[in-house]
């Protein structure tokens, strides 16, 4: 067996709820070995969250939109916030920046329309790479969309390798801004291409919007508000 080099990777994620930046560190050979490091969350200010959401749009002319001054300004601010969050994270966890081999920078999705052949995440990866002096990988969804895919969800590959040594049938339910499911059987099938994974529908993004609009809260902490209601048995 070939011993693959292990890399220390720092990942940045800003989901469709547009509430902040998630940061995590892993040590991995990219295939069979994953060691999870520290992780943390850095919320957007209410004003910046509002600015981000103001540029969400499913259908748009990308050539024109990418030249819009307002979007460029928000992208620059967003990139700066990621840089600031990384520095806070590294300092808090006493991690030497020179130990980080690569940064995965998802960016903030502001337009996702695979049927029209695009998914657009703002975030200037070149600027971030120059600020950090670390290699930055971005545009994770682009190639899949250009080849007829949906560009989502992203997490199934990670789910597969994270549980590779658990010889069971496994289903992940990821309740993010958009919920998604990942299903595979490690008992009989070790083929990454046979993962069943798909977006299941809106989740926290719509709940957060409703809670903010009606109750002026950021989110339904611990599901306290939801527990006061009742569910529709026919739908369930």
Residue ranges of model-derived segments:
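Short, Lys/Arg-enriched, disordered terminal segments
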Residues: 1-7, 32-33, 91-92, 98-99, ...
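N-terminal phosphate-binding or glycine-rich loops at protein starts, especially the Walker A/P-loop
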Residues: 2-43
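General structural feature for long, well-ordered alpha-helical segments within catalytic domains
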Residues: 8, 78-85, 124, 155, ...
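Short glycine-aspartate micro-motif
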Residues: 9-13, 99-104, 170-174, 197
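Glycine-rich phosphate-binding loop plus the immediately following alpha-helix
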Residues: 19-21, 26, 38-54, 130-131, ...
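Glycine-rich nucleotide/cofactor/substrate-binding loop typically near the N-terminus or early
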Residues: 27-84
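Glycine-rich phosphate-binding loop and adjoining helix at the ATP-binding site
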Residues: 99-157
């Amino acid at each position: 067996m070939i011993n693959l080099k292990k890399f220390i990777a720092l990942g940045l994620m800003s989901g469709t709820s547009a509430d902040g930046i998630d940061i995590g560190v892993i040590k991995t050979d990219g295939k069979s070995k994953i060691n999870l490091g520290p992780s943390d969350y850095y919320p957007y200010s209410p004003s910046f969250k509002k600015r981000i959401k103001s540029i969400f749009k499913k259908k748009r002319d990308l050539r024109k939109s990418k030249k819009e001054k307002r979007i460029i300004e928000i992208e620059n601010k967003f990139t700066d916030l990621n840089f600031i969050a990384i520095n806070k994270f590294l300092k808090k966890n006493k991690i030497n920046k020179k130990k980080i081999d690569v940064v995965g920078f998802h960016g903030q999705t502001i337009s996702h329309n695979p049927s029209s052949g695009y998914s657009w995440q703002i975030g200037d990866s070149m600027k971030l790479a120059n600020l950090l002096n670390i290699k930055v990988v971005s545009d994770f969804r682009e190639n899949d969309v250009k080849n007829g895919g949906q560009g989502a969800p992203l997490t199934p590959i990670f789910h597969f390798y994270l549980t590779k040594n658990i010889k069971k049938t496994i289903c992940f339910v990821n309740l993010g801004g958009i919920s998604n499911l990942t299903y595979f059987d490690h008992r009989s099938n070790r083929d990454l291409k046979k993962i069943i994974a798909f977006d299941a529908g809106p989740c926290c993004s719509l709940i957060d919007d409703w809670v903010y609009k009606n109750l002026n809260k950021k989110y339904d902490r611990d599901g306290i508000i939801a527990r006061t209601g009742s569910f529709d048995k026919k739908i369930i």
